[in-house]
UniProtKB/Swiss-Prot annotation:
Pfam families: Cu-oxidase_4. The keyword Nuclease does not apply. It catalyses: adenosine + phosphate = alpha-D-ribose 1-phosphate + adenine; S-methyl-5'-thioadenosine + phosphate = 5-(methylsulfanyl)-alpha-D-ribose 1-phosphate + adenine; inosine + phosphate = alpha-D-ribose 1-phosphate + hypoxanthine; adenosine + H2O + H(+) = inosine + NH4(+). InterPro entries: Cu_polyphenol_OxRdtase, Cu_polyphenol_OxRdtase_sf, Cytotoxic_necrot_fac-like_cat. It comes from Pseudomonas aeruginosa (strain ATCC 15692 / DSM 22644 / CIP 104116 / JCM 14847 / LMG 12228 / 1C / PRS 101 / PAO1). Homodimer. This is Purine nucleoside phosphorylase PA4543.
């Protein structure tokens, strides 16, 4: 569990954040070992134990979501699983929690350390505006926010069709710079981190940190759905400390 990641961003001291990896759990292959996804056909008892270990180590209460590649943002509630793709909280000890295995996890906080949020951004949610919706849910100006982009599929592995490129370019012409033609006709290699920065910048958020990971190629640390459709999920969490 020492292999878990701590985001490198200038967040206030009371803002805590963490990204789990594959290490430190009890799940068997192909979910080995710290799978936190209850929807991927893993042994439910293993997932329960993995989540218990997570909660015990971090001393917070994760708020799990039923993620559907949409733009709904909810207030984090550890007592139930809400259908949404982002959550926010102003309550100490409540962790906004996102599960991914190639999609982009984005963590948010305000500069005063009073609110946090987490968003799940696959290409559909990203194009539909889940990051912008998360910014709006926090109720503070964009220049008062900090964002950290967590582990997602990298630009050398994320091949998409022309319809994906068109969806982003239609909203922001600058998005053309996030797509490079692939070796396959009509296909493009997409930079999801650049796309996120473009969307956030257009919404007034410029203090964006992180990026540079690739879940597809980093087999030791991260699950990747594109690499193997039968796989686990790791979590990205952000919360306020008392």
């Amino acid at each position: 569990m020492n292999a878990w990641l701590t985001p490198d961003w200038p967040a206030p001291a009371r803002v805590r954040a963490c990204v789990t990896t594959r290490s430190g759990g009890v799940s068997q292959a192909p979910f080995d070992s710290l799978n936190l996804g209850a929807h991927v056909d893993d042994d439910p008892r293993a997932v329960e134990e993995n989540r218990r270990r997570l909660t015990e180590r971090l001393e917070c209460r994760p708020s799990w979501l039923d993620q559907v590649h949409g733009v709904t943002v909810v207030e984090a509630d550890p007592s139930r699983v809400l259908r949404a793709d982002a959550s926010w909280s102003a309550m100490p000890g409540v962790a906004c929690t996102i599960m991914t295995a190639d999609c982009l996890p984005a963590l948010f906080c305000d500069r005063s350390g009073t609110r946090v949020a987490a968003a799940h951004a696959g290409w559909r949610g990203l194009a539909a505006g889940v990051l912008e919706a998360t910014v709006d849910s926090l109720g503070v100006p964009g220049d008062e926010l900090l964002v950290w982009l967590g582990p997602a599929i990298g630009p050398r592995a994320f091949e998409v069709g022309g319809e994906v490129r068109d969806a982003f370019v239609a909203a922001h012409a600058e998005a053309r710079s996030a797509f490079v033609p692939s070796a396959n006709p009509g296909r493009f290699m997409a930079d999801i981190y650049r796309l996120a920065r473009i969307r956030l910048g257009a919404h007034g958020v410029t203090a964006v940190h992180g990026g540079g990971f690739c879940t597809f190629s980093d087999t030791a640390r991260f699950y990747s759905y594109r690499r193997s459709s039968r796989t686990g999920r790791f979590a990205s969490l952000v919360w306020l400390q008392d």
